[in-house]
């Protein structure tokens, strides 16, 4: 039974984007509901968010997929709401934010996270640190990891190596002051612009981004081989936890102690 947040405490709400087509993944079912250690990928993602401090989730789904997602999330540890996505990820996020703004309880939220359902194994400490950074005053927060591969910029028959010392790979969940990210998405919709992620949406309108440490565990499931790797990661985390009855998100919590962006210095909110 999902635990409801104290009515006097503004909830931390996660918009979980699960409306993608998954054309590169293929397979008989969408990757969001593909099995990962016996559970749907989206269910594992919501459990991981809950383990890190999210109180409720708004899952954005493709039209016609509501029943599949409701079944997949029937045992969610936190309350889950469903909203139909748009033609693009950007539209889907905006639909999720509008749902929160119009909901009698969720509209009290001041902190919102936006997460890709296909990053199911995000460790709890990453979620905690994103939330803590926002609650300590950051407007837009994203987890990042170092780029470890050599990157070449290719132009026809010529190429050059890109200095990777300042490059970072961006992950989710990204965290925001709800009023600001909502305003930015609405303005972007009016202008007809497009961005690659929600941090870019905030930066477009002059807001500063804050970075916290991400995790290699939080891989994005794009192709079938990614699911195989995620399966190995999840089983390894479960073995390390030695608690077969605990949620995957809780087991991943033990992988690394909680650390927030150094300049903010904040522990877990729970």
Swiss-Prot record:
Q: Residues of the signal sequence?
A: none
Enzyme Commission code(s) on record? 2.7.7.60
Please cite one Gene Ontology biological process associated with this protein.
isopentenyl diphosphate biosynthetic process, methylerythritol 4-phosphate pathway
Pathway per its UniProt entry is:
Isoprenoid biosynthesis; isopentenyl diphosphate biosynthesis via DXP pathway; isopentenyl diphosphate from 1-deoxy-D-xylulose 5-phosphate: step 2/6
Name the catalysed reactions: 2-C-methyl-D-erythritol 4-phosphate + CTP + H(+) = 4-CDP-2-C-methyl-D-erythritol + diphosphate
* Sites marked Transition state stabilizer: 24, 31
Entry keywords, A to Z: Isoprene biosynthesis, Nucleotidyltransferase, Transferase
The record's function comment reads: Catalyzes the formation of 4-diphosphocytidyl-2-C-methyl-D-erythritol from CTP and 2-C-methyl-D-erythritol 4-phosphate (MEP).
Name listed for the protein in its UniProt record: 2-C-methyl-D-erythritol 4-phosphate cytidylyltransferase
Q: Which organism is it from?
A: Cutibacterium acnes (strain DSM 16379 / KPA171202) (Propionibacterium acnes)
């Amino acid at each position: 039974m999902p635990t409801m947040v104290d009515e006097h405490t503004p909830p931390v709400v996660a918009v979980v984007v699960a409306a993608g087509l998954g054309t590169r993944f293929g397979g008989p079912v969408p990757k969001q509901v593909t099995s990962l250690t016996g559970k749907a990928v989206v269910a594992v993602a919501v459990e991981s968010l809950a383990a890190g401090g999210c109180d409720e989730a708004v899952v954005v789904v493709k039209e016609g997929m509501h029943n599949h997602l409701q079944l997949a999330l029937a045992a969610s540890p936190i309350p889950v709401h469903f909203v139909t996505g748009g033609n693009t990820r950007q539209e889907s996020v905006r639909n999720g934010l509008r749902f929160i703004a119009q909901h009698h309880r969720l509209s009290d939220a001041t902190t919102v996270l936006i997460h890709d359902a296909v990053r199911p194994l995000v460790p709890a400490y990453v979620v905690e640190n994103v939330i803590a950074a926002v609650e300590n005053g950051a407007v837009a927060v994203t987890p990042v990891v170092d780029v470890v591969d050599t990157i070449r910029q290719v132009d026809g028959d010529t190429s050059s190596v890109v200095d990777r010392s300042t490059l970072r790979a961006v992950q989710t969940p990204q965290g925001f002051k709800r009023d600001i990210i909502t305003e930015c998405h609405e303005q972007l919709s009016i202008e007809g612009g497009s961005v690659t992620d929600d941090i870019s949406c905030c930066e477009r309108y002059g807001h500063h981004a804050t970075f916290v440490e991400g995790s290699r565990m939080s891989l994005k499931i794009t192709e079938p081989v990614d699911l195989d790797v995620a399966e190995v990661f999840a089983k390894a985390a479960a073995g390390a936890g030695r608690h077969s009855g605990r949620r995957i998100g809780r087991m991943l919590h033990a992988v690394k102690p909680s650390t927030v962006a150094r300049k903010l210095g904040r522990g877990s909110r729970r």
